[in-house]
């Protein structure tokens, strides 16, 4: 256990859920990561660090573009990093490396990367000012930084509605404050600009990102509901600890909620995200 419940969750139930359903989550989140990568303009030879790389899909995708340079994925979840390494070995990718690394607590080597990227991996820092300063010092002069993060909870039914339905039956963690570590800690675009500017980044651009998420086939509504619960660090521990009847009730409630959001045979729910880019001057 650590003093950061988010880190504990990603090394616990949420991390295990992401490993179990990695292909599903990669498909669901690909448009969000792609929105960032499309703005960064990766080139062969770029040295890239993928922050909060999880099970490694984005790092492997980056590696395929920047070869012969190495793409480095860092994460605090040992569980997910083990899966990432297994994936890399299975693909035969040789220009990728995965490191257990807390970007906030452990500065990376100075000027060791041309570009830093993150798909929903920078919202969980207890001290984001330190984390962003460490990312800044890891980049060369002229280096680029891009990430995607969520806007306000109320604008993200994709995340909130299944959890709110399930919360009537299983325990959830206390709701974090608006700037405390959580998926929504960077919802305020002015805060993003302030944090990055203070860290030494220039030309900070905050733009709306993808506005919906595909949570899976309508033929597997119950599976989609279970995944939505198990991957969420705010409710996954309580769901795992609950009795079987309570877990079943939670999944049933989330399933009913998600059944109202079927489009062309898919479960499609609204999202609100920011795509953020910045440079090192």
Model regions and ranges:
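A short acidic, Gly/Pro-enriched loop at the edge of an enzyme's catalytic core
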Residues: 104-115
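Helix-to-beta-strand junctions that scaffold the AdoMet/dcAdoMet cofactor pocket
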Residues: 125-126, 139-141
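Class I SAM-dependent methyltransferase SAM/SAH-binding core
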Residues: 47-106, 130
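A short SAM/SAH-binding and catalytic strip from SAM-dependent methyltransferases
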Residues: 114-129, 151
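Conserved catalytic/acceptor-binding region of the Class I
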Residues: 129, 144-217
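Core SAM-dependent methyltransferase catalytic element
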Residues: 199-202, 225, 274-281
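Conserved class I S-adenosyl-L-methionine
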Residues: 1-46, 57-61, 80-83
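C-terminal helical/coil "lid" or tail adjacent to the Rossmann-like core of SAM-dependent
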Residues: 3-7, 14-21, 203-264
């Amino acid at each position: 256990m650590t003093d950061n419940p988010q880190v504990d969750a990603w090394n616990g139930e949420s991390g295990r859920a992401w490993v179990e359903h990695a292909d599903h989550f990669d498909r669901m989140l690909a448009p969000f990561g792609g929105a960032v990568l499309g703005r960064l303009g990766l080139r062969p030879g770029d040295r890239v660090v993928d922050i909060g790389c999880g099970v490694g899909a984005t790092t492997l995708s980056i590696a395929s573009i920047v070869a012969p340079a190495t793409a480095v994925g860092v994460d605090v979840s040992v569980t997910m990093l083990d899966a990432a390494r297994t994936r890399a070995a299975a693909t035969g990718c040789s220009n990728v490396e995965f490191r257990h690394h807390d970007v906030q607590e452990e500065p990376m080597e100075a000027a060791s990367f041309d570009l830093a990227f993150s798909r929903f991996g920078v919202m969980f820092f207890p001290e984001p000012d330190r984390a962003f300063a460490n990312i800044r010092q890891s980049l060369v002069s002229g280096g680029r930084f891009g990430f995607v993060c969520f806007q306000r909870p109320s604008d993200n039914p994709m995340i909130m509605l299944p959890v709110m339905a399930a919360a009537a039956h299983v325990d959830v963690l206390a709701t974090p404050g608006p700037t405390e570590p959580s998926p929504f800690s960077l919802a305020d675009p002015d805060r993003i600009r302030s944090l990055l500017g203070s860290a030494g980044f220039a030309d900070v651009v905050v733009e709306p990102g993808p506005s919906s998420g595909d949570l899976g086939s309508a033929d597997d509504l119950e599976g989609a509901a279970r995944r939505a619960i198990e991957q969420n660090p705010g409710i996954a521990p309580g769901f795992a600890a609950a009795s079987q009847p309570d877990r079943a009730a939670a999944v049933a409630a989330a399933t009913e909620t998600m059944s109202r959001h079927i489009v062309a045979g898919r479960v499609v729910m609204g999202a609100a995200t920011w795509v953020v880019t910045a440079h090192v001057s």
